Amino acid sequence: MKTMKYILAALTVGGMMASCNTDIESLTIQRPLTYDDQYYQNLRDYKESDHEIAFGWFAQYGAQNSAAVRFMGLPDSLDICSMWGGIPSTENTEIWEEIRFVQKVKGTKMLCVAITRIDAETDDHAFKQAYNEAKAMPNGEERTAALNRSFEMYAEYFLDQVFLNDLDGFDADYEPEGDFLSGSNFEYFYKHMAKYMGPNPDITREERLQLIEERYGKEIASREGSCDKMLNIDQTSTSMTSLIPYSNYCFLQAYGGGTGAGGWPDEKVVYCCNMGDNWQGDMQSMYN
């Protein structure tokens, strides 16, 4: 009889445990705001209008554990986003879905960005191998031509990242710090990119379209905006004024304050402040 009592008790407890739902379910604490098609059309129209733009570098979007590190968490009013965290892998479909929504629906321009130092690149790249071989040549016209070709290959390396990933342009971070790709060499590199993007006065739209089609094929060349991608220089000073005609913007790293445009037109200079610095202060440097 005692045995039966123990068995019944065990069955009761087992039944109670079996009836518990142990599935982990996420709770919807706060639903994101949603907007209609007209809102997004108005947003895109605004970004196409003549206005003072909002620009920012964005990184750390690999975590996805907070709206603060997601593309959908970016302000709707942001005109241009420079993808400082790198280009996500194509397998990361969730991030790419957000990128495309922000890019195509909200109208935010997505830029590939890189610190352009050819000496710092690894030797496994074809452009770096060509560069190393060119540098080893004796001085003369052949060496200059070989170096220029390596700069073109380096430019094409970044062009591929923009066009193959359907991004909206390139942010060339010009901080040479002794790198060979500085001064006139950087200018040559930049102007080669300018054949494919940016406001190049030396090339017609038809010529640019032909170049894009020759390199990437008709499918990519026929995409909306393929001839209108942006080319920007990102620097700590207002040097390289020779590139003004080929640049949409100069992203000036004015982290310590100051708003001197140098020889650059005011409408092409975007003054940038690192909001992560001096976070305990009043951000007064943004307005000096």
Predicted feature locations:
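Bacterial N-terminal signal peptides that target proteins for export
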Residues: 1-7
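Secreted glycan hydrolases and related glycan-binding modules that recognize and/or cleave
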Residues: 20-288
